[in-house]
Amino acid sequence: MTRRNNGHSARFLVASASWFSHHSGMIREPSRDRPGRSPAVAPSFQHERALLKRGVWPVAGCDEVGRGPLAGPVVAAAVVLDPKRIPKGIDDSKRLTAARREELFEEITATASFAVAFASTARIDRDNILRASLWALARAVHALPDMPRHVFVDGRDRIEIACACEPVIGGDGIVLSIAAASIVAKVTRDRLMCKLAQDCPGYGFETHKGYGVPAHLEALGRLGPSPHHRSFFAPVVAARERHRAPPIGESASATETSAGISIEATI
């Protein structure tokens, strides 16, 4: 799906194929790798600007959210910020309140080119969480309206894309376009989990977003797995065995796809 926002294009995709990771050199954030680190510094546009000065553009940032939860998809986002219209206050999504993330989401999607891709629970079960996440990241990059010439991706893994890829450990706290992608991915996934909560009430997806908090574990043990749970994550395996339920399989994909399309229409 492609949408226009103030002259910029946005695309949303549902992930449906596996991808492999590659390891290579990367930017590293010293403050996150050593004890006694200094206070967090806000991400900057200096890495993108350095490439722009060399004539390398578009430059995208890419991040994902949802590797750790017991339920719901992984959501990846790729963002190309407009150097002349960068929203103020962009930061690692984890440092922001939910309300501030929502505000910045609207500003980013109104001024930047971006794309979002979903890796369903069925894909996660089939390919494993790492491969599904890397596939969604690559899918988001390839879905951008214009293929970037350089991509900064959060983490240590390269992704299979048709342009230069630079992993950045702790990138959502260093590279501004990665931070923007982290906000887009987080808000998109949170909204999706609220939709899935309507489809499967009782688990509290709207509050914990699928993460393994005590209330979620209690509901999982009491109700058994829903079609949105990841079959091979340990607490889900235990609940499935307790309820003698088969692996969830492909049934989650259609529901997530439907919910994703609904969310795309409202964002």
Swiss-Prot record:
Residues annotated to bind a divalent metal cation: 63-64, 154
EC numbers on record: 3.1.26.4
Catalyzed reactions: Endonucleolytic cleavage to 5'-phosphomonoester
Localization annotation: Cytoplasm
Coarse class of the protein's main subcellular location: cytoplasm
Residue ranges of every copy of the RNase H type-2 domain listed in the record: 57-245
Cofactor: Mn(2+); Mg(2+)
GO molecular function: manganese ion binding; RNA binding; RNA-DNA hybrid ribonuclease activity
NADP recorded as keyword: no
Keyword Cell membrane tagged: no
One GO cellular component, as annotated: ribonuclease H2 complex
SUPFAM superfamilies: Ribonuclease H-like (SSF53098)
Annotated Pfam families: RNase_HII
Main enzyme class: hydrolase
GO BP: DNA replication, removal of RNA primer; mismatch repair
Keywords: Cytoplasm, Endonuclease, Hydrolase, Manganese, Metal-binding, Nuclease
Cofactor note as given: Manganese or magnesium. Binds 1 divalent metal ion per monomer in the absence of substrate. May bind a second metal ion after substrate binding.
NCBIfam families named among the record's database cross-references: PRK00015.1-3
Family: Belongs to the RNase HII family.
HAMAP family from the UniProt entry: RNase_HII_B
Biological role stated in the UniProt entry: Endonuclease that specifically degrades the RNA of RNA-DNA hybrids.
Record protein name field: Ribonuclease HII
Lineage summary: Bacteria, Pseudomonadati, Pseudomonadota, Alphaproteobacteria, Hyphomicrobiales
